[in-house]
């Protein structure tokens, strides 16, 4: 109860200013003005990349038909234009692209697909680790072990991103949630692209068909989750995995990737509990092998992909924590990227150093990551010329940094900081 009362006191003392409120405008004109004033740079090529994936997916998807796809495209365009919905859909655009591309995989003609690798993963497993770890862990089964594997793999795995999004919104610095959304989306998008270019059979295929060559006519299998269906008298996992758009997507393991990325973000916000978060990663890795869905080498690939995406986001965009602050409403300014230490950042804020560009800003200190110096050009220009948590200025401001920190934020800033993302 003491922790809860302390949290309530902190929340009551917070300056919950207008910059943390939802944008409620339905007028699309501010979005068009933002686009018109955007300082375009090579970093905006990411949207060309996303558009290319969406166009490819729309070409190959057979259901829904043309008008269905046209209607969805129009709704998405409206959602990205109207400020009320833009603050949600803009940070999620990468996740939406990944989901549509993942769904489109079931419609890709077989003549466009590369051959399926059946022997590569078990061979690598034996070469690197001296044995097939997945086979060893799945030999002994028991209903209790099935439940222990099902809870994180079949339940927590799918709910964790939403729970973590809520936690990051409340307890992380403003701007962390959109960084999490984009990092999560890009990790999954790259993972699916690798699975499309390098299709590999999972352990359940070896158990069912041996090392015989595979074809795309083979349907997916729930593996060990079939025992969960039998235990509860359902067919949820059997039906779900049998109709999966990506049957031969063993490498990299996005189950391991999700768990690792979740652990990295939570460890960033709650470093004291990082061992618990990484313990969950190990637990889920055991589940994937016990349920015959992945080889250990798949898990390594998925975790490496998550680490690469997180490090990139951390260096360039992830807001820094500040000592003594727990809730997002306690932050008066935010520094993006980790080119500077927390001590140096706090010192810059106290002294009003010109290297600190306002309430929420990048630092142009020479010791920062070199690439960070041009990140202001990546962001959409704020036509009101106001600073807010999650925004950048379209032109250098003459006032000192200390004055900028004390200025009230723009009332048009979203709680998701969506309109100012690169």
UniProtKB/Swiss-Prot annotation:
Enzyme class (EC, first level): transferase
GO terms (BP aspect): mannosyl diphosphorylinositol ceramide metabolic process; sphingolipid biosynthetic process
Topology in membrane: Multi-pass membrane protein
One GO cellular component, as annotated: Golgi cisterna membrane
Enzyme Commission code: 2.-.-.-
Annotated spans, Disordered: 386-406
Subunit text: Component of the inositol phosphorylceramide synthase complex composed of at least aur1 and kei1.
One Pfam family from the record: PAP2_3
Keywords, sorted A to Z: Glycoprotein, Golgi apparatus, Lipid metabolism, Membrane, Phosphoprotein, Sphingolipid metabolism, Transferase, Transmembrane, Transmembrane helix
Modified residues (Phosphoserine): 353
Function: Catalytic component of the inositol phosphorylceramide synthase which catalyzes the addition of a phosphorylinositol group onto ceramide to form inositol phosphorylceramide, an essential step in sphingolipid biosynthesis.
Subcellular location field: Golgi apparatus, Golgi stack membrane
Keyword Transmembrane attached: yes
Family affiliation: Belongs to the AUR1 family.
UniProt-annotated glycosylation sites, renumbered to this chain: 132
Protein name per its UniProtKB record: Inositol phosphorylceramide synthase catalytic subunit aur1
Source organism per UniProt: Schizosaccharomyces pombe (strain 972 / ATCC 24843)
Activity: how regulated: Inhibited by aureobasidin A (AbA).
Membrane-side (Cytoplasmic) residue stretches: 1-47, 86-87, 181-183, 267-274, 314-422
CDD domains for this protein: PAP2_Aur1_like
Coiled-coil spans in chain: none
SMART domains the UniProt entry points to: acidPPc (SM00014)
GO molecular function: inositol phosphoceramide synthase activity
PANTHER family documented for this protein: INOSITOL PHOSPHORYLCERAMIDE SYNTHASE CATALYTIC SUBUNIT AUR1, PTHR31310
